[in-house]
UniProtKB/Swiss-Prot annotation:
Binding site for Ca(2+) 2: 169-170, 228, 230, 236
Post-translational modification note: Glycosylated.
Matches recorded under Gene3D superfamilies: C2 domain
Assembly with partners or alone: Homotetramer. Heterodimer; heterodimerizes with SYT2 in presence of calcium. Interacts with SCAMP5. Interacts with STON2. Forms a complex with SV2B, syntaxin 1 and SNAP25. Interacts with SV2A, SV2B and SV2C. Interacts with RIMS1. Interacts with PRRT2. Interacts with DNAJC5 in a phosphorylation-dependent manner. Interacts (via N-terminus) with RAB3A. Interacts with SYT12. Interacts with calmodulin. Interacts with DNM1 (via C-terminal proline-rich domain (PRD)); this interaction facilitates vesicle fission during clathrin-mediated endocytosis (CME).
Gene: SYT1
Binding locations of Ca(2+) 5: 301, 361, 363, 369
Residues glycosylated per entry: 25
Name this protein carries in UniProt: Synaptotagmin-1
Co-factor binding comment: Binds 3 Ca(2+) ions per subunit. The ions are bound to the C2 domains.
Residue list for modification Phosphothreonine: 126
Length: 419
């Protein structure tokens, strides 16, 4: 029996048995959520272990954490702001697109516009002229003045009262205004107000008198020009206006405001400018004149240049007391001299003398022609009077100033009148 069963067992085919062998420590497969939590906890434990190894106090770690949080918040804020800015740009683009989009109404109005342009062409108007019309003129301020006539003495009385809203021509945002008053067409007698420093609303309250017969007054024009004073360069004109005398009713006193207008270009030929200094020592009775330089002199020679030199006359009551002159500078319109001349003038006489400065062009063959002339001292006006007054107010100190040369005949006429 045993042998038979043994033979059957050997003859039968082997039975394959599949057995699943699990490791001893294996558990059931975990869900995805539980796996993530385990991974996070492991990372946390690892991070905390590394953190404990850093040799820093707790407060430092807290500060680092706060800074990190602030950096993250700042980055988020910047990103949000950039996104909002892009949205706004898109909206603007849409609005522009809407404005630029062709409207059927605009197309219908196109014919009318073309018709209007044709009408303008017939009337001679151009687009440039149409654009210039709405432009406002530059505001130069205004001036209040008064006019009256003294029939008994044949005198025109001009009052310069005040100015307002003048433009600022100086660096500090102000101006140093004064007013010139003269009659056209002669322009021989000019008056100037005092300079008011650093103001755009000066109050003058000055009156000037012109000796003019009433029969001749109708053919004259009164000019009032406001200037900005500058010691070391040419004075800038702010604005002016003209009053034809034949339009004024002299039956009563005229007092009114007038807006200043842009000044017309000077028709008179420019003769140039000269710079000289004045110094007076009262105790010694010594007046020193230093001729420094001249510029932009009138061309007197054929070659377009000049040979300028300067004469200085000390005068009193129309008489020449002393005469000096500089060296001649050849072939130049901008000569530099820096030559000093002294005059003895007692203190009691300094208010009565005049210093007349004349620039001449030297000529070997003919007469030396005068280029221009200016005088300071007794009865001088404007910039010349201010220069003289500054010298007297600052004894022993040289005071330099530029002066505009005037026509010789006009200066001689002023010297003759003001004896």
């Amino acid at each position: 029996m045993v042998s038979e069963s043994h033979h059957e067992a050997l003859a039968a085919p082997p039975v394959t048995t599949v057995a699943t062998v699990l490791p001893s420590n294996a558990t059931e497969p975990a869900s995805p959520g539980e796996g993530k939590e385990d991974a996070f906890s492991k990372l946390k434990e690892k991070f905390m272990n590394e953190l404990h190894k850093i040799p820093l106090p707790p407060w430092a770690l807290i500060a680092i954490a706060i800074v990190a949080v602030l950096l993250v918040l700042t980055c988020c804020f910047c990103i949000c702001k950039k996104c909002l800015f892009k949205k706004k740009n898109k909206k603007k683009g849409k609005e522009k697109g809407g404005k630029n989009a062709i409207n059927m109404k605009d197309v219908k109005d196109l014919g009318k516009t073309m018709k209007d342009q044709d009408d303008d062409a017939e009337t001679g108007l151009t687009d440039g002229e149409e654009k210039e019309e709405p432009k406002e003129e530059e505001k130069l301020g205004k001036l209040q003045y008064s006019l009256d006539y003294d029939f008994q003495n044949n005198q025109l009385l001009v009052g310069i009262i005040q100015a307002a809203e003048l433009p600022a021509l100086d660096m500090g945002g102000t101006s140093d205004p004064y007013v010139k008053v003269f009659l056209l067409p002669d322009k021989k007698k000019k008056f100037e107000t005092k300079v008011h420093r650093k103001t755009l609303n000066p109050v003058f309250n000055e009156q000037f008198t012109f000796k003019v017969p009433y029969s001749e007054l109708g053919g004259k024009t009164l000019v009032m020009a406001v200037y900005d004073f500058d010691r070391f360069s040419k004075h800038d004109i702010i604005g002016e206006f003209k009053v034809p005398m034949n339009t004024v009713d002299f039956g009563h006193v005229t007092e009114e405001w007038r807006d200043l207008q842009s000044a017309e270009k000077e028709e008179q030929e420019k003769l140039g400018d000269i710079c000289f200094s004045l110094r007076y020592v009262p105790t010694a009775g010594k007046l020193t004149v230093v001729i420094l330089e001249a510029k932009n002199l009138k061309k007197m020679d054929v070659g377009g240049l000049s040979d300028p030199y300067v004469k200085i006359h000390l005068m009193q009551n129309g008489k020449r007391l002393k005469k000096k002159k500089t060296t001649i500078k050849k072939n130049t319109l901008n000569p530099y001299y820096n030559e000093s001349f002294s005059f003895e003038v007692p203190f009691e006489q300094i208010q009565k003398v005049q210093v007349v400065v004349t620039v001449l062009d030297y000529d070997k063959i003919g007469k030396n022609d005068a280029i221009g002339k200016v005088f300071v001292g007794y009865n001088s006006t404007g910039a010349e009077l201010r220069h003289w007054s500054d010298m007297l107010a600052n004894p022993r100190r040289p005071i330099a100033q530029w002066h505009t040369l005037q026509v010789e005949e006009e200066v001689d006429a002023m010297l003759a009148v003001k004896k």
